[in-house]
Swiss-Prot record:
Quaternary context: Homodecamer.
The organism of origin for this protein: Aeromonas salmonicida (strain A449)
Positions bound to substrate: 28, 106, 128-130
Residues annotated as the enzyme's active site: 20
UniProt-recorded name of the protein: D-ribose pyranase
Gene name of the record: rbsD
PANTHER family listed in its UniProt record: D-RIBOSE PYRANASE
Pathway: Carbohydrate metabolism; D-ribose degradation; D-ribose 5-phosphate from beta-D-ribopyranose: step 1/2
Length: 139
């Protein structure tokens, strides 16, 4: 049995395969998932697992240099936006490297998600609760 924190086999393999600047989209239950990227569907029911839980699991093993979010989250879901910013800031401190935050319109976000290595679907049902993690380097 794997000893680390991240026990989900597809997520663990995904993180192990990430190279510098590779991207993972972590999304809510409603984001359309295009053909192309690997689809890792973790949604069990509305709200389970939530986006923050999925993000927490991924961040146990992933070095992140940039996060991209839809700008609409700031106005439509400000509490979730702030919680994600807090979680990203905590990870930045833990990894000892800054994490840039970028925003784009939701339609641009959906287009950008096509270049992700994988799209990880959570059970999150908060509007615009999606992000793209851009991998950094561990050295």
């Amino acid at each position: 049995m794997k000893r680390g924190v991240l026990l989900n086999a597809p997520l663990s393999a995904l993180v192990a395969q990430m190279g510098h600047t590779d991207e993972i989209t972590v999304c809510d239950a409603g984001l359309p998932i295009p053909a192309g990227p690997e689809r890792i569907d973790l949604a069990l029911m509305a709200g389970t697992p939530n986006l923050q839980t999925v993000l927490k699991a991924l961040l146990t093993d992933l070095v992140v240099e940039k996060v991209i979010m839809a700008s609409e989250i700031k106005l439509i879901s400000p509490d979730t936006h702030q919680a994600l910013l807090d979680q990203i800031e905590t990870h930045s401190l833990e990894q000892g490297k800054p994490i840039a935050i970028e925003y784009c319109l939701h339609e641009e976000f959906k287009t950008r998600s096509r270049q992700s290595k994988a799209i990880v679907r959570s059970g999150e049902i908060t509007p615009y609760a999606n992000l793209i993690l851009c991998a950094g380097v561990a050295f």
